[in-house]
Amino acid sequence: MNQDIFIVDGARTPFLKSRNRPGPFSASDLATAVGKTLLARQPFAPSELDEVILGCASPSVDEANIGRVAALRMGCGYKVPGWTVMRNCASGMQSIDSAIANMRSGRGNLILAGGGDALSRAPLLYSDQMVMWFSQFAAAKTTGQKAALFLKLSPAQLLTPVIGIMRGLTDPISGLLMGQTAENLAHRFGISRAQMDSFSARSHARVIRAQDCGIFHGANEGLSPDSLSADRLSSEIEPLFDAKGTLYKDDDGVRKDSTAANLAKLRPFFDRKYGNVTAGNSSQITDGGAWVLLATEEAIKRHGLKPLARIVDSQWAGLDPAQMGLVPVHAVTPILKRHGLGLNDLDAWEINEAFAAQVLACIEAWKSVDYCKSELGLDSSMGALDEEKLNVDGGAIALGHPVGASGTRIVLNLLHVLKRTGGKRGIASICIGGGLGGAMLIENVS
């Protein structure tokens, strides 16, 4: 059943940068808060959803099957199934793709799909050696045995935890940190430190411009209770309030002083001797959540919904994990071929900015005759992507990359860009730890 699937609404939280301590919201808090606001403005009850699907890479230990947790907390009721997907950085795009598959197989007409992560709450873990010590201590039967174990205990063992997020950002096959895979691409395509820093400064500048123009908030810029109904649909971000009543209204990782010159002062992080990838030209560790509401034509007619975009096609691809950041090229290209499109036949692009080097490598790969022939099976290069159409409101280098949410965010932002500019078609694409990539072609119908 190849029926059309439409995005009829969507929203996200502000993306909140990790400040080296647990943030104010868990992943389910983020998903629930923005989901409640999104559902409250719909002409149907949350219990009329057919399904809720949430992507999450790092739920808390008390958020098992976080998709179900969020569905219940959003008021969807016991009868609406809620479940969780995990495809690392593309978890939020996988949730959309999974929803589409279910809708096209006749298993739903109205599905809420999204993603969320609170990376600031990634755990600190005991080492295997320390866990073994606890096991031995629990098995010790006499005071003497326990005392002997205490004498063997090194303060360094106790006070040097395993940093969970560093383990999560390390590929288990290649043994490389994600930033080291970006260094591989920079070396392969001859991408300089200056190019990376210039790209990163542009990301910050574009987010600042979008914030100054109220683009992310639309009619919600003043947080007025009068800015409701149709006007409110122009808002991408919905504000958050924590338990103390503190308002979180904007993405807070962007820096107005992020110029190429300032970024050039930062030291390489992943290859300290020879590298060029720094904290400044990499995505930030961030907390955030996002949803899109998907509907078939039947659901649109039944509830009087307004379709905003049609999801035309999607594609997943894989490469050597050590070349992780290049896979968007391999996910996007088959979509373009299937629809007879060139790079610049699209009106807008989103390529998630895991690393500046990684996005720039994708652009260089399409330009390379050798790469297009040997790796993509093409007769010539794809040409130069118009960077004025790419990440026009900035990207993860300035906004942050809450892993489970980013795939949904780039689809949502792409929709808003097409609406705002009157563009017809756009692609959202994302690289994925483990040597994967995903892409989604959407068409503006509003």
Where in the sequence are the language-model features?
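Active-site pocket-lining segment
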Residues: 183, 233, 243, 312-315, ...
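Short, well-ordered amphipathic alpha-helical segments that serve as non-catalytic structural scaffolds
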Residues: 27-43, 66-70, 95-98, 178-185, ...
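Conserved beta-ketoacyl condensing-enzyme motif
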Residues: 24-143, 221-223, 227-230, 235-250, ...
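N-terminal extracellular/periplasmic Venus flytrap/periplasmic-binding protein-like
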Residues: 12-13, 24-28, 33, 41, ...
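Active-site-proximal alpha-helical scaffold in enzymes
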Residues: 86-117, 125, 186-215, 227-230, ...
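Flexible glycine-/small-residue-enriched beta->alpha junction loops
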Residues: 110-184
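Condensing-enzyme catalytic core mediating Claisen C-C bond formation in acyl metabolism
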Residues: 1-26, 37, 153-168, 260-326, ...
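Conserved catalytic cysteine-centered active-site region
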Residues: 56-111, 121, 157-159, 173-177, ...
